[in-house]
Amino acid sequence: MLPCKLGNVLQRTVNNVEYVCMPSKKNPIDKKRIADAVREILLAIGEDPDREGLRETPNRVARMYHELFCGLHEDPAAYTKKFFSESYNDIILVRDISFSSICEHHLMPFMGKIHIGYIPDGRVIGLSKLARVIEVFSHRLQLQERLTEEIAELLYKELNAKAVAVVVEAEHTCMTLRGVKKPGSLCVTSALRGGFLKHPSSRAEILALINKR
């Protein structure tokens, strides 16, 4: 889908598109140690890791972790190096970028959508590269608050943008599947940089565009 200009907004909505972080051959994650640890967990909960249904589970989990945490060994800034030199100096917004990550507190998934808006200062990045940056940061043990800040800070510095806004909406399975068990509850975090932080009118505009449905 090509971006469309709406007023002073260059906007593209990304729906149901997955940007997969592919594990690198240089990824130093030790799959054997993970598999051994999973086997010990199965024993610790009273299961038989040698029964048919669990025999390959340790290796499956090891391969899964190799994929889920591949962002630990990838530099998200690499996706910001190629940009277009453009005179466009109003808001660019990419809304509803789906993501999932693993919370470092309980090692349980949280997932949702990320909205990124920025005002360029001569550097416009390819829209898919924003999703790539998200994929690298989200394929690590994370906290939603830190994930939000990391994305905003990287884009603000690497693009030398006039303003950056990142809003993350996520459902945490550590709250929906355990503990208080409140499915459907969302955590919303935001990080603002530059003009969106300094100027109330700019902040109100970008938040209105993000919330517009």
Q: Which functions belong to the PLM regions below?
A:
Residues 10-213:
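A domain-level signal for the structural core that forms small-molecule/cofactor-binding pockets
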